[in-house]
Regions:
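Structural recognition of the beta-strand scaffold that forms the well-ordered cores
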Residues: 57-62, 94-101, 147-152, 201-205, ...
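Bacterial Sec-dependent N-terminal signal peptides
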Residues: 1-27
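Metal-dependent phosphodiesterase/phospholipase catalytic core, i.e.
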Residues: 100-103, 114-180
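Long, acidic (Asp/Glu-rich), low-complexity accessory segments flanking structured domains
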Residues: 20-91, 104-142, 211-213, 281-360
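Surface-exposed substrate-engagement region within the catalytic domains
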Residues: 177-316
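Short amphipathic alpha-helical segments and helix-helix/interface helices
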Residues: 85-86, 136-137, 168, 172, ...
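Short, flexible active-site-adjacent loop segments at beta-strand->alpha-helix junctions, enriched
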Residues: 65, 156, 207-209
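Short, aromatic/basic amphipathic alpha-helical patches
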Residues: 162-174, 214-223, 334-348
């Protein structure tokens, strides 16, 4: 038997609806954008309320693209976030796109060692991979009903620190060290449930650092095409799953990007348990990821997806994982980004349709 959950005024109530019905203050009226009703932001600890036997693949999870850039970067080019990792966690973000490369760090008068550090392309953030993992681990210790997902890849654009064998060794050692506590590790399976993931950090690495993942899984078949792919693979040590994904980030055609985002929401809604979906509103317009082109893209896509998710006529279902830029930012200068409203609309979606439950 399937169960339905919806949060209204902080309580879990049954909802027997097929369409995505909204409460009165969440309905979107087809009038001028500046006067339409908006969902309320404030989504921390939303996973705690979900049933243990809900399939993780069926959840709607907000995530941040190049999440650590909000903690500070060496310069503004490539800065995709405005909030720190802690602030992102506080608003309900649970998927964090982290791009660890490595650099030499001074440990003594004449001693330097290589350490994992987070970059976006050639842009260095002010956050080490160790520090980023600690933020998530500390929050899980304080909120054991939650879980986090790290989506990572080797950011090797630095001309000085781009040796894959060095990165492989550093990452293999880190993921089996006390800096990544054993109680946070979990092997990937397609049918992982919320209960199994509580208190864990699921690591999905787009680059293989060893012959088999130390924890989590490897992701292969990534695509940056406008059409995305439904044939990528998430491979754990003992099981693998189909991954459906859209990451068209160098956006030459705004309408095509929006159509692809919506298409992958629909694909996620129709997916069977065990099939995972990762969808990106993130990217930039034009040919370079400048501050203005990233924010323009966020305005284009975040608002369009927000409107789509809060349309009461849309059939309900999972959105999968959705990564966005400038989470938590309603507007910046002349750009209406909806970075606070879209994550909450994604979170709300978990409580507006019949979750598929393992064993029922």
């Amino acid at each position: 038997m399937r169960k339905t959950f919806i949060i209204i005024a902080g309580a879990a109530l049954a909802l027997a609806a097929v369409s995505c019905e909204k409460t009165l203050d969440e309905q979107v009226i087809d009038i001028a954008p500046e006067t339409r009703a908006l969902t309320k932001a404030g989504g921390n600890n939303w996973i705690t309320a979900l049933p243990d036997n809900a399939y993780a693949s069926q959840l709607s999870i907000p995530g941040t693209h190049d999440a650590a850039t909000g903690d500070g970067t060496t310069f503004s080019l490539g800065k995709t976030q405005s909030l720190t990792l802690q602030e992102q966690w506080n608003m309900g973000i649970r998927v964090f796109d982290l791009r660890p490369g490595y650099k030499k760090v001074r440990k003594g008068l004449f001693k330097y060692v290589n350490e994992l550090h987070i970059y976006h392309g050639i842009v260095e953030t002010r956050t080490s991979f160790k520090a980023a993992v600690k933020v998530l681990s500390d929050n899980l210790a304080a909120n054991p009903g939650e879980f986090a997902i790290i989506l990572m890849r080797f950011e090797n654009d630095s001309p000085l620190y781009n040796k894959r064998d060095v990165w492989n060794s550093l990452m293999s050692s880190f993921l089996t060290s006390s800096d990544f506590p054993a109680e946070r590790r979990i092997d990937f399976r397609p049918d992982l449930t919320v209960g199994e993931l509580r208190g864990k950090i699921l690591v999905l690495s787009r680059d293989a650092y060893a012959s088999a993942p130390s924890t989590g899984a490897f992701v292969s078949g990534w695509s940056h095409s406008v059409d995305g792919t439904t044939n990528a693979v998430i491979s754990g040590r003992n099981a693998s799953a189909t991954l459906q994904l859209q990451d068209y980030y160098s956006v030459e055609n705004k309408e095509a990007k929006i159509a692809s985002i919506k298409n992958y929401v629909d694909i996620a809604s129709a997916a069977e348990p065990g099939v995972w979906t990762i969808n990106h509103t993130s990217g930039y317009t034009g040919t370079i990821g400048s501050d203005s082109s990233i924010k323009q893209n966020a305005e284009n896509n975040n608002v369009a997806l927000y409107d789509y998710l809060t349309d009461s006529s849309r059939p309900c279902g999972s959105t999968g994982i959705i990564l966005l830029d400038h989470a938590g930012v309603r507007s910046s200068g002349s750009y209406d980004i909806y970075g606070d409203l879209l994550p909450q609309a994604i979170i709300d979606n978990n409580f507006a349709f019949q979750l598929r439950l393992k064993g029922e």
